[in-house]
């Protein structure tokens, strides 16, 4: 087998893989231009890449455009894979600087000879970041470029504009050799027309369509009209996550959450929730047990605040049964009831009217008497020898018909009511203990 033909087949296969980005294990990024290549080929011709691949395992090698320009690298990359330079003219000084940067001494004399073969009169072209824009009338395939002339079948002003500004069609990988020119010439004109009409998909498929630029710079008035109508129809209901109330605007929801933060409501909310961008943008409320319970508590608090003046005029009091008081823990410190709420629980108890917090139940009860203009009377709860009576002392106004000499509390005494104010019902006790 001929060694020369074997090497030629190998180079052609590697170059084809580079063109379509297939089986390439390396990407060289120069600015915003990306080149697919093989590590072995780059390391064989450049000591710069050889040292990088030895000490680095990254698949993307980033190079600054100030070190080597994309058109110079594309020129040298084509020589590495084909052994011959593309039909284009590059600046000789910049070419030498790029070769010195890559430490590709072997490519120095080849690139110089190839650059001197073509004179500026034979090929007049401009290379911009690897995209070749040709001014000739025939199809020319360059580095990373496929220039096609506008089809003659087009009529009208659009045909004239496309004739002055030919469209650009790029392959999947930047870099095509001259071997594919015959295949590109065989493509029918209908496929070229379809390629002209397709919009750009990625960075590697840039197009010089003046009409598309004009359409982008001057948007149609229909799009401007439909914009506000879409925003008006997309109004969302703002929902409080802590008590279940709904609001029409975000500002009302933010003011409502301030009441949670300040402690006016029995649900503690962190202050950072007020600075959230997605405040109140929630889905419709699920009718689960937690939401129903939260709404019930919030409506109860509002109802109690409205009925507050009526309670001050009443002389009678509702007794709190021992069965209700038994919900309170026997510990000296307040505990948390198992209410399965989603908000955070705190040890302190807050007043449902003004929001003040107290560490003990007795202090909270004394504070609630101040809202009614009455003085809290400690002496009305007589001390008993039994420890159970001492725990219930802050919630009792009087224990009637009990002898001071008795050493225990009988079952009849446990059935007697405790004279508390009417607000301390079962729901009020739950509200006081849970925050």
Swiss-Prot record:
Domain BTB residues, every copy: 1-107
Q: What is its main location?
A: nucleus
- In the UniProt record, does the keyword Metal-binding occur? yes
Q: Pinpoint the Glycyl lysine isopeptide (Lys-Gly) (interchain with G-Cter in SUMO2) cross-link.
A: 142, 148, 198, 204, 303, 330, 405
Where in or outside the cell?
Nucleus
Described purpose of this protein according to its UniProt entry: May be involved in transcriptional regulation.
What this protein is called in its record is Zinc finger and BTB domain-containing protein 25
